[in-house]
Amino acid sequence: ECENTECPRACPGEYEFDEDGCNTCVCKGCDDAQCRCSSDANGCESFCTCNTRCSAADECNPRCTCK
């Protein structure tokens, strides 16, 4: 039986199916290649974009959670 999985905010519709046929989120977090953060003035994430590899250090602030 599947849990009702909700993907992180800013990643709507980014689902994939696991081996049980349950949907899971593709976008995992800032240390994942599938999630890019943009940081605000306080160094916290303002939004994240799924399925994009990070290209700059400041786009992957380690304090970001992207969740």
Swiss-Prot record:
GO terms for cellular component: extracellular region. Residues 2-27 form the Antistasin-like domain. It comes from the Eukaryota. It is found in: Secreted. Eight disulfide bonds are present. Keywords: Disulfide bond, Protease inhibitor, Secreted, Serine protease inhibitor. The record marks 36-37 as: Reactive bond. Potent thrombin-specific inhibitor. This is Theromin.
